[in-house]
Amino acid sequence: MYTSGYAHRSSSFSSAASKIARVSTENTTAGLISEVVYREDQPMMTQLLLLPLLQQLGQQSRWQLWLTPQQKLSREWVQASGLPLTKVMQISQLSPCHTVESMVRALRTGNYSVVIGWLADDLTAEEHAELVDAANEGNAMGFIMRPVSASSHATRQLSGLKIHSNLYH
């Protein structure tokens, strides 16, 4: 069968255009890794901050993955929070040493709009970079939940800049 050079050029142009569109889309999409430090005695504050975002992400066709240390998500809580029960997955009783590794693998797949993991210790620079790369690759969000007790919150030194009042008088 004979095909004209024009027809061949047209099909190669469309495949090149789709490749350029895919590359430009990949370059403009970005993931996000964020650490959320919250007081264990005030979990409602964290819910007030994160629930609107999680509800919005629940409108996507992708899953939400919760990597929880011990607690199991309550079906009633998920529904009452306005999260899509059919899109929420949970893995519980995951040891902290496997949480970062599991988050990286899940974020990289692109199957999850958000991956939430609980860690008591700070991330190393290498772990953070690995999570950021995975979130960018999967165009997903990752939240590291870091609980602090009320007593440690009251005794730790706050980081910030102290402005002396004599600068203003």
UniProtKB/Swiss-Prot annotation:
Is rapidly cleaved and degraded by the Lon protease once DNA damage is repaired. Induction: By DNA damage, as part of the SOS response. GO terms for biological process: division septum assembly; DNA repair; negative regulation of cell division; SOS response. The record marks 169 as: Essential for degradation by Lon protease. It comes from the Bacteria. The keyword Cell division applies. Pfam families: SulA (PF03846). Residues 106-112 are annotated as: FtsZ binding. Gene3D superfamilies: P-loop containing nucleotide triphosphate hydrolases. Keywords: Cell cycle, Cell division, DNA damage, Septation, SOS response. InterPro entries: Cell_div_suppressor_SulA, P-loop_NTPase, SulA_CellDiv_inhibitor, SulA_enterobact. Residues 162-169 are annotated as: Lon protease binding. Belongs to the SulA family. Component of the SOS system and an inhibitor of cell division. Accumulation of SulA causes rapid cessation of cell division and the appearance of long, non-septate filaments. In the presence of GTP, binds a polymerization-competent form of FtsZ in a 1:1 ratio, thus inhibiting FtsZ polymerization and therefore preventing it from participating in the assembly of the Z ring. This mechanism prevents the premature segregation of damaged DNA to daughter cells during cell division. Interacts with FtsZ. This is Cell division inhibitor SulA. The gene is sulA.
